[in-house]
UniProtKB/Swiss-Prot annotation:
A Pfam cross-reference name: LuxS
Complex and partners: Homodimer.
Record GO terms (molecular function): iron ion binding; S-ribosylhomocysteine lyase activity
UniProt catalytic activity: S-(5-deoxy-D-ribos-5-yl)-L-homocysteine = (S)-4,5-dihydroxypentane-2,3-dione + L-homocysteine
Official protein name in the record: S-ribosylhomocysteine lyase
Co-factor binding details: Binds 1 Fe cation per subunit.
């Protein structure tokens, strides 16, 4: 099985909250697709709550589009990581980490501005596979923590696992 890019970085050295360019690729038509690692929690030390991350999934995707989409950037998808330490965001374009961090902070403020659970988009059995597994309170707690901590940048060069380590795993 091929080694995926996300498993070639040392998770023991990741900072959080932090933005990382996980991957960049060109399409056959010449557009650039960039995948960002939006790390909310330090791997193997913290985890996002099940209900909180699910509610963030519903809110974060729209709010990030509000703050990041432009003539040169279009978000394709924002999805939670299976390890529940953050989200992957795939987009067309090449925004800098600082631009992404600013959009992320603005989106977290938007999460804090949501008044009631009923205001969570697509919160119904037709549009959500586990529509009862949500908590606006937990999502807002996550948002407060991100805003209070600020957002750093993780760089692949600082986190890459050596070939020697990878061969031994």
């Amino acid at each position: 099985m091929p080694l995926l890019d996300s498993f070639t970085v040392d998770h023991t050295r990741m900072n959080a909250p932090a933005v990382r360019v996980a991957k960049s690729m060109a399409t056959p038509k010449g557009d650039t697709i960039t995948v960002f690692d939006l790390r909310f929690c330090v791997p193997n030390k913290e985890i996002l709550s099940e209900r909180g991350i699910h509610t963030l999934e519903h809110l974060f995707a729209g709010f990030m589009r509000d703050h990041l989409n432009s003539d040169s950037v279009e978000i394709i998808d924002i999805s939670p990581m299976g390890c529940r330490t953050g989200f992957y965001m795939s987009l067309i374009g090449t925004p800098s980490e600082s631009v992404v961090a600013d959009a992320w902070l603005a989106a977290m403020q938007d999460v804090l501005n949501v008044v009631a659970q009923a205001d969570i988009p697509e919160l119904n059995e037709y549009q959500c596979g586990t529509y009862e597994m949500h908590s606006l309170e937990q999502a807002q707690e996550i948002a407060r923590n991100i805003i209070a901590a600020g957002i750093n940048v993780n760089r692949n060069d600082d986190l890459s696992l050596s070939d020697e380590i990878l061969k031994g795993l």
